[in-house]
């Protein structure tokens, strides 16, 4: 890495030398050939950990569907995950687009432009594959586990559809005449008939393998009706009653949140 030393001059003629280190990031594409030895960023542990094993099994299946997982070679949350929109695990119609199901840069990796680098790599790859553009889920204001709308807007994305619960579909077309992606009708008005707590989730997020059973146990201990529906195919996910399928919690039919629950958060929710 390149290092630069500058001198700052203050009014009292004090001087202070500050070392600025310019960071360069190296990325690697995770494939079936190297997945067993590579970490998957958001769940860094050994392959026997339930969070790691469930996510890696899901990834292996999705690689056959065209999924790309590009990540930093360093340990931590710095990666992008995308696949052809026809194979996305969400109720969207976006033929010819590439769907980004996760773009996450966190901790010490934030503020260095790595998110932009990952997105640029996705754009270049998608153009080379003849895609019409990119699409991704977000919202009007920043929400947990969704891309920052300010960042998306800065990169040229625009809102092309919105569900009743405020979840938005954003797109970045590569041609002016590209068709607009849209939510399927089942996702526009997130509502279900079942009473009590109902969770729709997939194995796309590794934390689900650990925390869904924990929340189920908390619900049992507190005599609360809780049903967990594990979407196990793209067809099930593409017809789910929610634009977000990675984690969508309902209560008495109404959509509550996409924020993942652990025992502490769920108990806090029950106390309201």
Describe the function of each predicted region:
Residues 252-272:
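Non-catalytic, surface beta->alpha helical segment in thiol-disulfide oxidoreductase systems
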């Amino acid at each position: 890495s390149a290092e630069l030393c500058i001198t700052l001059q203050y009014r009292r003629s004090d001087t202070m030398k500050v070392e600025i280190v310019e960071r360069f990031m190296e990325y690697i594409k995770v494939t079936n050939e190297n997945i067993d030895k590579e970490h998957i960023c958001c769940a860094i542990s050994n392959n026997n950990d339930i969070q790691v094993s469930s996510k890696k099994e899901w990834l292996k299946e999705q690689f056959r569907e065209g999924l790309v997982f590009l990540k930093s070679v360093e340990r931590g949350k710095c990666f992008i995950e995308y696949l052809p929109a026809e194979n996305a695990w969400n109720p969207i119609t976006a033929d010819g687009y590439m769907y980004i199901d996760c773009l996450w840069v966190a901790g010490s990796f934030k503020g260095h432009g790595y998110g932009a680098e990952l997105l640029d790599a996705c754009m270049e790859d998608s153009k080379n594959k003849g895609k019409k553009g990119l699409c991704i889920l977000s919202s009007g204001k920043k929400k947990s586990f969704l891309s920052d709308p300010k960042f998306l807007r800065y990169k040229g994305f625009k809102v092309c559809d919105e569900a009743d619960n405020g979840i938005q579909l954003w797109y970045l077309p590569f041609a002016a005449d590209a068709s607009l992606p849209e939510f399927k009708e089942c996702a526009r008005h997130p509502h279900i008939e079942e009473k009590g707590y109902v969770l729709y989730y997939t194995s796309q997020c590794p934390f689900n393998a650990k925390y869904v059973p924990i929340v189920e146990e908390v619900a049992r201990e507190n005599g609360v009706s809780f049903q967990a529906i594990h979407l196990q195919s793209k067809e099930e996910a593409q017809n789910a009653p929610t634009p977000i399928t990675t984690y969508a919690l309902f209560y008495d039919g109404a959509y509550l949140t996409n924020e993942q629950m652990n025992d502490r958060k769920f108990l806090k929710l029950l106390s309201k």
